Amino acid sequence: MKIRIDIPHHPYDIQIEKGCLAQAGQWLRELWQPQKVVIVTDNHVASLYAEKVKLSLEDAGFQVAVFDFLEGEERKNLTTVQKVYEFLVKQGLTRSDGIVALGGGVVGDLAGFVASTYMRGIHFVQIPTSLTAQVDSSIGGKTGVNTPFAKNMVGTFAQPDGVLIDPLVLETLGKRELIEGMGEVIKYGLIEDPELWALLTELDGSVESILEHAETLIEHSCQVKRKMVVEDELDNGVRLYLNFGHTIGHAIEATAGYGKVMHGEAVAMGMVQISKVAEKKGLMPAGITQSITDMCQKFGLPVDYENWDVDKLYQALTHDKKARGNTLKLVLVPELGSATIHPVSLEEMKDYLVK
């Protein structure tokens, strides 16, 4: 299946197909002329797929080198970026060459940031290998790295030339790594797609059910992301809906120490906490918090953060990228399948951190 991201200045396709990783070279040959390519990946994904993708690209006429770094959110920083820059220089990459981001969200965010800043921007594509990356982070052109202050605090908007999604690679994910991706999938059902929510309701929450329906879950999620990115590429309007659960979620990730709490886990806890307070304030319908909690728990996602520290979380929130002056744009769900922006002051945001 192809999904067109029809952005006027940089349209591209998301290709979703079981087994398509083996045809990565042919796919890239349709996008780029043969040239130098660097595959950026982490050491875990490299051990599984780097050689397979490298050979496919070489068979298509590309000159290929591989850069891998230690896996983990804690490696998504400017230190790693500098190492990639140095590798690109040693490989002699020019502005006519490109980067292939092969991995999960950490790899995609970092590789995209490198591509958008090296020589003021070179071409790149995304080949996401985690569920979170396949349904969310590989699409839409947000790149970035973390700082000690906040998640993704340094970044750019830079669209890839294409996204290649092979649902079969999810079979090599660990259980926790697969399940955390469901945090984003559940979010899509809540903010935009009642049909997706209905499907999630039917599934039994097992790993087997996720893998069996992975292609459908990915397609639904990508369609929601496509709609919002095309309408609001630079994150000033409806694209903000995609941040449901992320305001508190990112704060949890930052205060826990990057890598301790996975992104989808933090999003799940963020959605539950925001909904609980918003429901009490009459801003979300009665019972929705329980529905979200039940759905997250069915798939094995955490709904409560054991190291909850209001002061530390609030400090992290002050660095949120959605902040404008002293106001945060909080995303709420007034009814299933619909989202809205609710501006709150940073001071009022403290209410949403109270258990």
Curated annotation (Swiss-Prot):
Cofactor: Co(2+); Zn(2+); NAD(+)
EC number, UniProt record: 4.2.3.4
Residue positions binding Zn(2+): 184, 246, 263
Cross-referenced Gene3D superfamilies: 3.40.50.1970, Dehydroquinate synthase-like - alpha domain
Binding locations of NAD(+): 71-76, 105-109, 129-130, 142, 151
Catalyzed reactions: 7-phospho-2-dehydro-3-deoxy-D-arabino-heptonate = 3-dehydroquinate + phosphate
Broad class of the protein's primary localization: cytoplasm
Gene Ontology biological-process entries: amino acid biosynthetic process; aromatic amino acid family biosynthetic process; chorismate biosynthetic process
GO cellular-component term (any): cytoplasm
Keywords: Amino-acid biosynthesis, Aromatic amino acid biosynthesis, Cobalt, Cytoplasm, Lyase, Metal-binding, NAD, Nucleotide-binding, Zinc
GO molecular function: 3-dehydroquinate synthase activity; metal ion binding; nucleotide binding
Pathway, per record: Metabolic intermediate biosynthesis; chorismate biosynthesis; chorismate from D-erythrose 4-phosphate and phosphoenolpyruvate: step 2/7
Localization in the cell: Cytoplasm
Lineage: superkingdom: Bacteria
Function recorded in the entry: Catalyzes the conversion of 3-deoxy-D-arabino-heptulosonate 7-phosphate (DAHP) to dehydroquinate (DHQ).
Protein name (database record): 3-dehydroquinate synthase
Gene name of the encoded protein: aroB
